């Protein structure tokens, strides 16, 4: 289905912003749920707000939708301030995790509901509903009722109902959270394809890192009411700007310590457990930065960047001895847990290339290059 099928998109200009939040706060009975959130969402972008439960992400989405009013700050959609605009007049539609379908209406009547509220003519309504059904591949289920279709099909109907109204921005509140793992992955691909076909701006809230990474153009990582970092999935994963982001996005090995010295190309950190670990100097808080001797830092090393060997490798840096504590066979890859002699535990993830796995308690060596070690300030500047 192309962009013109539902007459949703105009010619996209990804240098323009569809949504702008300007130092937005939200206070509930003395508790500040959103603390000065400030970001732009570009036209036609798939933008995700990612964070743990209670971080303020759903409140932020509800502020954009108009279901909540900011305590301070401003929300702008398509260049217009929404300060005095109620939810029903905003150019947005929302897909909820619960789908909120009308059980007494058929699939096609659920999709047509908003069009009928707008008093569109019968012929135009039927045409738009048919296009929406085709978009989500639900033509054969048009006359069924919500209790006669699966959870994944209900999700498609909710999506079609939101898109048929031609919103400038589609808001998605954990839309795949009620689906099982296999169906969720399938729907991630379908949702991404629909976004690419239509060019509508999607704003999704989720706590699922894999979900956000697989579908988003950019991700805003939220923590305790604040935005920790905004970037592409690759930027967020490879260059986190705080220990929280490094730990929340995927798996990582974290070491706390103090900088012993640096020479403008690398730095050496003495960890709290006594290890001397080399890191690349330019990788400070995910970007070029300055860090000095005596500074407390957190080092992050991704499990897939760590090598594992039964024998001492021919390397001069970041090589440590330990014993194999646990092995988790995952099919395409294997997770190893190694207890270092220092007392630290390390996760190692390697592709499944061996037919046999080492026995538990086997002496092992873990090692990694300084280029794969990221130094992070304990408090994000």
UniProtKB/Swiss-Prot annotation:
It is a peripheral membrane protein. Keywords: ATP-binding, Cell inner membrane, Cell membrane, Membrane, Nucleotide-binding, Translocase, Transport. The keyword Cell inner membrane applies. GO terms for cellular component: ATP-binding cassette (ABC) transporter complex. PROSITE patterns: ABC_TRANSPORTER_1 (PS00211), ABC_TRANSPORTER_2 (PS50893), POTA (PS51305). SUPFAM superfamilies: MOP-like, P-loop containing nucleoside triphosphate hydrolases. GO terms for molecular function: ABC-type putrescine transporter activity; ATP binding; ATP hydrolysis activity. It catalyses: ATP + H2O + polyamine-[polyamine-binding protein]Side 1 = ADP + phosphate + polyamineSide 2 + [polyamine-binding protein]Side 1. Its EC number is 7.6.2.11. SMART domains: AAA. ATP binds at residues 51-58. It is found in: Cell inner membrane. Residues 19-249 form the ABC transporter domain. The complex is composed of two ATP-binding proteins (PotA), two transmembrane proteins (PotB and PotC) and a solute-binding protein (PotD). Part of the ABC transporter complex PotABCD involved in spermidine/putrescine import. Responsible for energy coupling to the transport system. Belongs to the ABC transporter superfamily. Spermidine/putrescine importer (TC 3.A.1.11.1) family. This is Spermidine/putrescine import ATP-binding protein PotA.
